[in-house]
Amino acid sequence: MRNGRWLVAGAAGLVLAAGITYVATAGPATAGHPAAPRPASKPTPLAVVAVTPADGAAMVAPDTQVQVTASGGMLTQVTVASGDSAATGQYGPGSTSWSTRWGLKPATSYTVTVVARNSKGAATTEVTHFTTKRASRILQVSSITPSSGETVGVGMPIIVDFNYDVARSDRAAVERALEVGSDVPVTGAWFWASDSEVVFRPQSYWPAHERVLLTAHLTGVPGGPGLWGGSDLSYSFKIGDSHLVKVNLKTDWARFYINGSLARTIPVSGGMGGYDSFGNDFYTTSGVHLTMGSYDSVWMTSPNIKPGQPGYYHELVYDDVQISDSGEYMHQSPGGWWCLGHENCSHGCVRMTADGAAWWRHTAYRGDPVIITGTPRVLAWDNGWGYWQESWSAWLAGSSAGPVTTTALAEASLGAPSAGPTSPAASSPAPIPTTVG
């Protein structure tokens, strides 16, 4: 018995002496049989990170998209920073990719810091640097209509004027950088009214009581040779009650609707029609006008006619609401009360009763649609804010990026807007019009 026990122990000693190091990981043993050994598991590789632009890159175009990818793991942190500011970006599916959403500042050094983790949680950290090229000119917004915080009508456009002309090849990029948000998403499009002015209009009127936010992500946006956007800005305004005015100059009556219900019916008198020897057209324009401002009073002067010549006048007219750039207003009739509701007697404006004109001046927002019918003269789309004169297909033809859907605003989306240039709301006194009365 003693010899047998020694032999078993010796056998075990022979196994150990053979230098086999994986006995501890062996599977379960059965009676009379030693456990089978298993090889040790290999360590999980670390995630591999790739960054574009490459480390040390210089003269990077400001509209370059920074792209980060991770293979064999997930991205858990990405920052593209310059000083205290960081570029906005978004992760791709599965957090294996990340890219900047908007442009970069010109002539700026950026540091990219990336952390990725493999399936075991082990981290890979990558830090790279690059520098963007300098701009010879900086594209900026010089004015925006309506004013920040203003309450406007359902037809109100957003009019953005730039300090430089924008090249046709870069207009789509500029449009995409002008992000419009609203409580209820609507379809709309930007339209280039000139080389330096772009206008946003919904396909249909804005819903009443809507908040609207414009965010101009202009940083790093190209505008032409050597022209790059240098900074962002945002501002908001509100759509008020729905005001819709229908003026029929065949019957000489105007109907005013508020939130879909008829609020008032007012007798009016439009342009008398015809032309004078000075080339003045005395027809009121038909079409979809927008109210452009309200005034206590406006001095109205006959265009192209000097004092002492037939047809000259220069008179102060009260309770004025401007509806075009060719001198058309809705206002209190300065006389000829018998014409209201019966005959067109004015030089092109829409005359109203004293109480009706005062009520409308105090009720109207900028951007209220005023639809005038019954005359042979048609409002041009570029006469004031005649943008609704363009069909939707014609409006899209003036866009480089095509239709967009406004971004739905969260309840907290409208914080304090950044300071930006806006056009002032109209106030008395108004500029002297070219066609009046």
PLM ranges: what are they?
Residues 116-117, 218-220, 260, 297, ...:
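Short, charged beta-turn/beta-strand-edge "cap" motif at the junction between a beta-strand
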Residues 90, 191, 262-271, 382-384:
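Short amphipathic beta-strand/extended segments with alternating polar/hydrophobic composition
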Residues 3-241:
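Acidic, low-complexity Ser/Thr/Gly/Pro-rich repeat segments typical of extracellular/periplasmic
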Residues 161, 165, 169, 297-298, ...:
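Structured segments of extracytoplasmic/periplasmic soluble domains
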Residues 67, 111, 127, 159, ...:
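Extracytoplasmic/secreted envelope proteins and their assembly/folding machinery
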Residues 226-338:
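Gly/Pro-biased beta-strand-loop elements
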Residues 154, 241, 283-286, 301-437:
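Exported/periplasmic cell-wall-interacting domains
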